[in-house]
Structure formats: C-alpha cells, structure tokens
C-alpha cells in the first residue's frame, strides 16, 4: 500500500503588518518559511493551501519575493503546491488578476481556477473553488451540487464562511449539508482557529487555521489548539490527520488593575519576561479606578522593557468626576491632611505613596506660595491669605 501524505495550510496572509509593525510582517514570513521546512522534512507528496496566501490582492513586493523564494524550495524538492484564492487575495476590480496567476506563470504553484477541473496527485483527486462572496452564494451552492469526484480518495478545497462555525447573518455562505457528499475530505480556509468535523462514512471537514496570531480573538484558540499545519495521511481507505505546530510569537490578553499598577506590571514582567527571542505582545484590559492618562501611560511604558508592543484592548476603569468628589474634613484640618486626602481619594495614590509625598513637602522650603499653590490644586482657598 502506497503512503500518500498531504500538508494542509491556509490563511498565511503574506504581507500582513499587524498594527503596522515591521517585525510582525517579518513574523508572518517566518511562519510561512517554517511551513515549507515542515513539508520538506516530512517528505510530503503535496501541499494544499485553502486561500488568503497573500493578505491583499495587490501584495507588497517583499511578500511576493518571499513567496517566490519559498515556493522555489518546494519545487526543487519536487513537492507541488496546490492553491485556491481567499477573500483577501481575490480581485476587487474586474480588470485585476489573482496574484496566484503570477506564481503559476513561473510554474511554482497549481492554481485551481476551474471548479470542475481537478488536480491529480497520485490516486488522490483534488478539486477547489476560490472564495465566492455573499452576493453569489446561490451560484456557489449550484457549483457544489454539480461536483462529483472521480474516485473515493478526493479532496475539496474551499474558502467560505460555514454556518456551523459562524452562525451570524451575512457571515456564512454555506452549511455542511451544502457540501457534496462524495468527497472524503473537505479542507477549509477563512477561519483562523483550527476545527475538525467528523462526518458519516469517515468523511472529514478540517479547518487548518492561520499559522500566526493575526487578531486578538485568535489567542484563546491558539492556547487550546496551537498554530501550524495539518498532515493528512491517505494511506488507508479513511484519511487520518495529525496537527503539526510551529513556533509563533505569543500574544496574551492580560488584566491590569490601576489601583496598584506598578505592582501589577512587576508581576507581569515576572511571569512573561523570558529569554525567548520572540518577545510577546500584550492586549491589556484595564480595571480599577480611572487615573490621568499621562500618569497611566508613563507607568505602562515600563512594559517596553520586556515586550516589543502592547496596546490597551479594553478600558474598564471607573470614571470619577472630580467635581463630584467631596472630602469630609475636620474643622481643625491641616494642609498636610488636605494634601493627603487629595492624593488618596482623588489622585488614586496609595496611602504609602501619599504619606511619602506629604513628608517630602514637609521637608521642603516653607514659603507661603508653596502652600497657596497646593491649596489651589486641591480646590481649597486660603482664607487667611493677605491682600
């Protein structure tokens, strides 16, 4: 019995610059290179790519150069690269062409541009339909109904929204019942998190996912399923699959409480600062009391010492209107008590920090204008001020 293995990859999005960062664009190229390394190392019989090879229809020169360089490695190893287009790299204008056509012109890929014309890889027949938008979903269903593979060992490549995965109006074009039943394997792109559906008769729907974390919503899926490619073994009558993970830059959604921000950042560094060459990205959820933006950003700058990029993902801090804040003061209050109460109850300093500031002030020059300015700052006029 001959052993036939195919590597399924998808949604590589070459040219993608997450948050417009140079190093994130390079990360995307590095993950693609890792996938090619896997294909060569595993001596696979072919690679199938289910759409969004490029992030846009008119990719930057660097993305095309990376694609050409890596696909030449595959060609030299005798491994065919069979591909369809996704919604990102499909033409948006009638006069535009698929970037895959350029690669096919140099005999680097096999672009499945005709649904009824399969590619034969040994005893396996591979069909493919590039992304079809919502406005033409009835036409897509008609195309699917007409597909009849020549043999049992057959693969259908698609890049579509599937209702069972994304059941929102306008987000899907087909559902599982729309798939032609004669295929043994359905390889899907478009979704960035891995997923597998086992159907009757040993049929499999498999979503390879994107090989890198391209949106913060993918982090949870990455932590559960990893990122990389799927190795499909067609040696038996029923295909079997194996996930192969690759090394990607980690991203985390973390919660920081502004009530004790410095300590929170210290713990964050202690937990995530590693010797890994690819430092992580943080998506920060803020909790606690609202603090002045300049104070907040100054504190958060500390994260730059152990992460190349961070962003405030959600701000759940509670706003406090200083005009509505009232401090109950005893009749015999002192300037020190006024300052202390302001620092703790309005400026959100800790009690320790407030005492330290008051102590510093007490050790400073006792000139009258210092007290006057401090009293203005906290909104208390000096009734004893001499005119």
UniProtKB/Swiss-Prot annotation:
One of its GO terms (biological process) is double-strand break repair. Keywords: DNA damage, DNA repair, Endonuclease, Exonuclease, Hydrolase, Manganese, Metal-binding, Nuclease. It comes from Sulfurisphaera tokodaii (strain DSM 16993 / JCM 10545 / NBRC 100140 / 7) (Sulfolobus tokodaii). Binds 2 manganese ions per subunit. The active site is at 88 (proton donor). HAMAP family: Mre11. One of its GO terms (molecular function) is manganese ion binding. Mn(2+) 1 binds at residues 11, 13, 52, 192. Its cofactor is Mn(2+). This is DNA double-strand break repair protein Mre11. Mn(2+) 2 binds at residues 52, 87, 159, 190. Pfam families: Metallophos (PF00149). Induction: Part of the nurA-rad50-mre11-herA operon, these genes are cotranscribed. InterPro entries: Calcineurin-like_PHP_ApaH (IPR004843), DNA_Repair-Maintenance_Comp (IPR050535), DSB_Repair_Mre11/Rad50 (IPR053459), Metallo-depent_PP-like (IPR029052), Mre11_archaea-type (IPR032885), Mre11_N (IPR041796).
């Amino acid at each position: 019995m001959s052993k036939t293995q195919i590597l399924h990859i998808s949604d590589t999005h070459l040219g993608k610059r997450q948050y417009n960062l140079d190093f994130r664009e390079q990360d995307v190229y590095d993950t693609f290179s890792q996938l090619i390394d896997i294909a060569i190392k595993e001596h696979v019989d072919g690679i199938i790519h289910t759409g969004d090879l490029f992030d846009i229809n008119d990719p930057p020169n660097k993305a095309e150069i990376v694609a050409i360089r890596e696909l030449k490695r595959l060609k030299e190893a005798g491994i065919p690269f069979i591909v369809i287009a996704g919604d990102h790299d499909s033409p948006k204008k009638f006069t535009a062409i698929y970037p895959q056509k350029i690669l096919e012109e140099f005999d680097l890929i096999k672009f499945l541009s005709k649904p009824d014309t399969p590619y034969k890889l040994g005893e396996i027949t591979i069909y493919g339909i590039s992304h079809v938008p919502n406005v033409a979903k009835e036409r897509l269903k008609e195309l699917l109904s007409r597909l009849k593979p020549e043999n049992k060992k057959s693969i259908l490549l698609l890049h579509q929204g599937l209702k069972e995965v994304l059941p929102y109006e306008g987000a899907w074009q087909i559902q599982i019942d729309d798939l032609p039943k004669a295929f043994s394997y359905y390889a899907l792109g478009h979704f960035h998190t891995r997923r597998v559906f086992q159907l009757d008769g040993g049929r499999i729907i498999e979503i390879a996912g994107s090989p890198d974390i391209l949106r913060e919503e993918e982090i949870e899926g990455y932590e559960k399923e990893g990122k990389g490619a799927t190795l499909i073994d067609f040696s038996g009558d029923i295909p079997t699959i194996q996930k192969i993970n690759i090394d990607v830059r980690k991203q985390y959604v973390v919660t920081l409480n502004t009530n004790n921000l410095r300590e929170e950042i210290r713990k964050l560094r202690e937990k995530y600062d590693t010797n890994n060459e690819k430092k992580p990205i943080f998506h920060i959820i803020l909790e606690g009391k609202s603090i002045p933006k300049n104070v907040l950003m100054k504190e958060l700058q500390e994260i730059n010492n152990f992460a190349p990029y961070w962003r405030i993902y959600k701000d759940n801090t509670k706003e406090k209107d200083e005009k509505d804040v009232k401090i109950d003061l005893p009749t015999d209050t002192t300037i020190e008590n006024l300052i202390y109460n302001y620092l703790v109850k309005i400026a959100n300093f800790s009690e320790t920090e407030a005492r330290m500031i008051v102590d510093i002030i007490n050790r400073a020059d006792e000139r009258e204008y210092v007290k006057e300015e401090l009293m203005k700052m906290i909104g208390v006029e000096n009734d004893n001020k001499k005119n």
